[in-house]
C-alpha cells in the first residue's frame, strides 16, 4: 500500500509523517452573509484527498481526515445545551456518505450527529460548476426529521457557499437555529 498523501510505502491510509502533518490543521474562517464557516485545510493542500470521495478508498481517507480535524474540534468544543452536527445531504453514494463520516466524529458532551435529516431534492451535481450555475440550480433541501436543538452544518468543502447558505436558510425558515458550518477545506485557499 501507499500513503494517500505522499505516495510513500505504508500499511496505513497515511504514513506516519503525513498523519502528523494532517493532524495539525490550520483552521480558516470564512464569513458569508454574516454566517461563519470554519474549515481545517486549504483546498489546495488536500485537493486529491477531497476528490477521493468518488471512489471506495475515499471512505478510509475521509475517516482519517475526520479523525485528524473534526474529532479534535469536538474534543475542544463546549456548549451549555444540546447541539446537533448535521451533515448536508448525507445520502449514500459510492458505498458511503462522506458528510456522514465527518459528522460522525463530532461527538462530545452536548454535541452529537443527526443523520438523514436534510437532503437535497435536486440531483444536479455542482462539481466544477460556477457561481451562476449554482445560483440558477438550487439544491431544494428538504428537512426529513424533527430537529429540536441548534445545528452545526457539516460538509467537505466550501466553494461559493451556495449549498451551505441554502441549507442554513432552509433550516432557519423551519425555525431551527444554525450556529455555524464546519468543512474540511475552503476552495479559496
Report each predicted region and the residues it spans.
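Short cysteine-rich clusters marking metal-coordination/redox-active sites
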Residues: 3-6, 15-18
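Charged helix-capping and loop-helix junction motifs
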Residues: 69, 97-104
Amino acid at each position: 500500500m501507499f500513503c494517500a498523501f505522499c505516495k510513500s510505502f505504508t500499511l496505513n491510509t497515511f504514513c506516519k509523517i503525513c498523519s502528523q502533518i494532517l493532524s495539525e490543521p490550520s483552521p480558516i474562517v470564512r464569513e458569508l452573509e454574516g454566517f461563519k464557516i470554519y474549515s481545517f485545510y486549504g483546498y489546495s493542500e488536500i485537493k486529491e484527498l477531497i476528490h477521493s470521495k468518488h471512489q471506495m478508498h475515499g471512505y478510509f481517507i475521509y475517516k482519517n481526515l475526520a479523525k485528524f480535524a473534526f474529532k479534535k474540534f469536538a474534543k475542544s468544543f463546549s456548549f451549555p445545551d444540546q447541539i446537533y452536527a448535521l451533515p448536508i445531504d448525507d445520502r449514500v453514494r459510492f458505498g458511503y456518505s462522506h458528510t456522514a463520516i465527518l459528522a460522525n466524529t463530532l461527538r462530545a458532551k452536548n454535541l452529537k450527529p443527526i443523520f438523514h435529516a436534510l437532503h437535497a431534492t435536486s440531483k444536479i451535481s455542482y462539481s466544477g460548476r460556477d457561481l451562476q450555475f449554482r445560483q440558477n440550480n438550487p439544491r431544494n433541501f428538504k428537512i426529513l426529521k424533527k430537529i429540536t436543538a441548534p445545528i452545526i452544518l457539516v460538509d467537505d468543502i466550501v466553494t461559493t457557499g451556495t449549498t451551505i447558505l441554502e441549507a442554513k436558510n432552509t433550516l432557519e425558515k423551519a425555525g431551527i437555529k444554525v450556529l455555524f458550518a464546519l468543512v474540511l477545506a475552503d476552495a479559496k485557499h
